[in-house]
Amino acid sequence: MPKHHQKAQSPGGSQRQLRVGEIVRHAVAELLSQGGVHDPVLEGHLITVPEVRMSPDLKLATVYVMPLGGRDTDVVLKALAANKPFIRTAVARRVNLKFAPDLRFRIDERFDEAERIEKLLRTPGVQKDLQQDSDET
């Protein structure tokens, strides 16, 4: 295909990937928040689902999760993995797709990264540089 006919891919994927990812995210978040998965670990944790990334063929969904407070992440991931077939079936019922996407659960580390950057910005060396930049303008 000539270059002028190629569509530019956004960082999160195509528009369809983003839309389907958001639909799957809502379905998983609703399922977890309403106690639809009968697992003592999952029932004992409040889990947020900030993002779902879909593969280009929409057959794989990477579900990013974060337990409230960021504690017990390994235990929560194991519980989600153990209940993956049930969650996949429940999501398939809520989402109208040709194929039920396979779910892959990952911990969302954006919060940790944002905190690390915030701490870095508060270091004396960076504060000094920022102060010098504001004095020059």
Swiss-Prot record:
Keywords: Cytoplasm, Ribosome biogenesis. GO terms for cellular component: cytosol. It comes from the Bacteria. InterPro entries: KH_dom-like_a/b, RbfA, RbfA_dom_sf, Ribosome-bd_factorA_CS. Its main location: cytoplasm. Pfam families: RBFA. GO terms for molecular function: ribosomal small subunit binding. It is found in: Cytoplasm. One of its GO terms (biological process) is maturation of SSU-rRNA. Belongs to the RbfA family. Monomer. Binds 30S ribosomal subunits, but not 50S ribosomal subunits or 70S ribosomes. One of several proteins that assist in the late maturation steps of the functional core of the 30S ribosomal subunit. Associates with free 30S ribosomal subunits (but not with 30S subunits that are part of 70S ribosomes or polysomes). Required for efficient processing of 16S rRNA. May interact with the 5'-terminal helix region of 16S rRNA. This is Ribosome-binding factor A. It comes from Rhodopseudomonas palustris (strain BisB18). The gene is rbfA.
